[in-house]
Curated annotation (Swiss-Prot):
Presence of keyword Cytoplasm: yes
Pfam family, one: PTSIIB_sorb
Domain PTS EIIB type-4: 1-163
Active site, renumbered: 13 (pros-phosphohistidine intermediate)
Protein name: Probable phosphotransferase enzyme IIB component M6_Spy0801
Gene Ontology biological-process annotations: phosphoenolpyruvate-dependent sugar phosphotransferase system
Protein EC: 2.7.1.-
Compartment list: Cytoplasm
GO molecular function, one term: kinase activity
UniProt organism field: Streptococcus pyogenes serotype M6 (strain ATCC BAA-946 / MGAS10394)
Amino acid sequence: MITQIRVDDRLVHGQVAVVWTKELNAPLLVVANDEAAKNEITQMTLKMAVPNGMKLLIRSVEDSIKLFNDPRATDKRIFVIVNSVKDACAIAKEVPDLEAVNVANVGRFDKSDPASKVKVTPSLLLNPEEMAAAKELVSLPELDVFNQVLPSNTKVHLSQLVN
């Protein structure tokens, strides 16, 4: 079972590896990212950021969807990290019973034109493609889509920010 999908353009870092995995009680972290799945240096870097005792899988978005829909995954607590709203939306549309997507940190490190981005919050800078994906994501039924950088922060529903 997926405990949460977190959209964070930094993928695995201290907030994710230590704070959120503990908060969500998720011993399995899946990075669903096409580029990371193909890049051995990125994979080594991500593995170094994960605490001992935690399992990390790095898969393409397509392979991640297959993994999440495998019946053997239903009894596991899985925390999923993607680096774009577009990827979170692709997973949310294909994986039934997904409950929560945390659009936490987006747009500060991508290579898109800063002038094209809308500053939704200090941690969310969405280009037109990501904004369209965010609007599609919040329109999906029975899915809690929110922005919460840290567990101690107030959860803000994304529909209040992008509509």
